[in-house]
């Protein structure tokens, strides 16, 4: 079954709505430039109240590996998502407080050899692919061009855990799953009423669409 991450959580009520709807993971954005940014203290409070079997993910754009390790320990994050091109394989390997997901924002000429090289040099086996938009690290609401996403995921095969993000919502996620067959899907803006504020009905609709699309 395709895994589901609801990203950009800023409120406990939204976190619990996502959990009870069937999300497998929640994302907390620690980039101060994001409209979905959350303070570590608030993230910790929310994570402490989550039910078991739901993983908490920290989204990091400009923190050092040392800062990431400290935040993962403080907030009890299970996953560190490196949402920036600045992180090298060596830096990723030095993050030991949580499992690491490396994000790529592919353009038309993207070569999957970049993924293979990063995996080999870092030991990471989970990668997320988000839509590319100059000057923005994610949460744009834009989708990856369909043929590009299909090519990348086909070429990756079963070499890693590949997660699809970028403009996914209840309307388009089912078709994306059938076409691309990702390990998991990730959405933020696709289940919001405004940045950082989730819509419980949209969350339920998204989860339902994922489950239907995966069959």
From Swiss-Prot:
Catalytic reactions on record = N-(5-phospho-beta-D-ribosyl)anthranilate = 1-(2-carboxyphenylamino)-1-deoxy-D-ribulose 5-phosphate
Question: Key word Amino-acid biosynthesis present in the record?
Answer: yes
GO MF terms, alphabetically ordered: phosphoribosylanthranilate isomerase activity
Enzyme Commission (EC) number: 5.3.1.24
- Which InterPro entries does the annotation name? Aldolase_TIM, PRAI_dom, RibuloseP-bd_barrel, TrpF_fam
Q: Superkingdom of the source?
A: Bacteria
Keywords annotated in UniProt: Amino-acid biosynthesis, Aromatic amino acid biosynthesis, Isomerase, Tryptophan biosynthesis
Q: Annotated pathway, please?
A: Amino-acid biosynthesis; L-tryptophan biosynthesis; L-tryptophan from chorismate: step 3/5
Per the record, the GO terms for biological process are:
L-tryptophan biosynthetic process
Q: Which family does it belong to?
A: Belongs to the TrpF family.
HAMAP family per the UniProt record, alphabetical: PRAI (MF_00135)
Protein name as annotated: N-(5'-phosphoribosyl)anthranilate isomerase
């Amino acid at each position: 079954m395709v895994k589901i991450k609801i990203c950009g959580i800023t409120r406990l009520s939204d976190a619990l709505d996502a959990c009870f709807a069937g999300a497998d993971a929640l994302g907390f954005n620690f980039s101060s430039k994001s409209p979905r940014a959350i303070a570590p203290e608030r993230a910790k409070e929310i994570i402490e109240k989550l039910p078991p079997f739901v993983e908490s993910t920290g989204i990091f754009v400009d923190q050092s590996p040392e800062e990431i390790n400290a935040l993962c320990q403080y907030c009890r994050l299970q996953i560190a998502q490196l949402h920036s091109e600045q992180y090298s394989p060596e830096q990723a390997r030095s993050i030991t407080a949580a499992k690491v997901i490396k994000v790529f924002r592919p353009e038309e000429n993207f070569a999957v050899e970049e993924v293979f090289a990063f995996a080999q040099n870092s030991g990471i086996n989970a990668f997320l692919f988000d839509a590319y938009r100059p000057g923005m690290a994610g949460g744009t609401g834009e989708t990856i061009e369909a043929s590009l996403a299909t090519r990348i995921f086909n070429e990756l095969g079963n070499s890693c855990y590949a997660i699809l993000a970028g403009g996914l919502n209840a309307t388009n996620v089912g078709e994306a799953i059938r076409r691309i067959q990702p390990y998991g899907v990730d959405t933020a803006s696709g289940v919001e009423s405004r940045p950082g504020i989730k819509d419980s009905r949209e969350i339920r609709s998204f989860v339902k669409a994922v489950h239907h699309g995966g069959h």
